[in-house]
């Protein structure tokens, strides 16, 4: 592809290319040079869109994966809504499992705050007290991120011939989610 026909570099395109690298090769293989090669630009061109460099890139990856709010206004039973949303969030986390370590190590609270607040609002509208709804939302987010990390690790070990092949991850996920939701329903 010649430079005349190259798609312009944008922040979104940079994040998408970085996700492609992390998803395919792992977080450790993400470098600004490799990212520049993927975008067909010099690595320094990326800094025009991400002035803080790799720090801003990593924050952008976290935001892209972690931000997945639940609409508080949608209808239906709150447990069913949370089950459906949680299943989608799990898929999102597993699709980009290379970013999971960043979700717990980066100082990017805004990325998870909006999503957690949307879950909290659903719980509050379901009749839970404010503090219980806040605790429940954080517990549910912790469960989702923790389960996705364990599942990604287990699947990787299984693919490498290690233990974990006999685990029914879907059953384990829904079983754990049911425990969390049952606890919230009793609150």
Question: What role is predicted for each listed range?
Answer:
Residues 1-9:
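N-terminal intrinsically disordered/low-complexity leader segments
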Residues 13, 17, 21-56:
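Helix-turn-helix
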Residues 13-20, 24-25, 56-72, 84-88, ...:
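Alpha-helical structural segments
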Residues 50-51, 61-62, 137:
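DNA major-groove recognition helix of helix-turn-helix
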Residues 69, 97, 101, 144, ...:
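Short amphipathic alpha-helical interaction/hinge segments
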Residues 70-111, 130-133, 137:
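Hydrophobic alpha-helical connector segments
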Residues 115-143, 147-148:
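A contiguous pocket-lining binding segment that forms or flanks enzyme active sites
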Residues 125-128, 153-187:
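C-terminal peripheral helix-coil segments that are non-catalytic and often amphipathic
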């Amino acid at each position: 592809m010649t430079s005349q026909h190259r798609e312009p570099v944008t922040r979104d395109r940079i994040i998408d290319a970085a996700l492609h690298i992390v998803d395919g090769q792992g977080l450790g293989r993400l470098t600004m040079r490799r990212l520049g090669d993927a975008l067909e630009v010099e690595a320094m061109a990326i800094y025009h869109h991400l002035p803080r460099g790799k720090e801003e890139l990593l924050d952008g990856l976290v935001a892209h994966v972690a931000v997945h709010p639940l609409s508080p206004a949608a209808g239906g039973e709150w447990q069913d809504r949370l089950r459906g949303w949680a299943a989608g969030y799990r898929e999102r986390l597993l699709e980009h499992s290379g970013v999971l370590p960043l979700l717990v190590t980066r100082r990017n609270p805004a990325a998870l705050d909006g999503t957690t607040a949307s879950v909290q609002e659903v719980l509050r509208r379901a009749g839970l007290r404010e503090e219980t709804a806040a605790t429940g939302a954080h517990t549910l987010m912790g469960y989702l991120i923790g389960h996705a990390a364990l599942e990604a690790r287990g699947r990787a070990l299984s693919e490498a011939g290690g233990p974990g092949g006999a685990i029914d991850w879907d059953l384990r996920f829904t079983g754990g989610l049911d425990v969390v939701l049952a606890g919230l329903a009793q609150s």
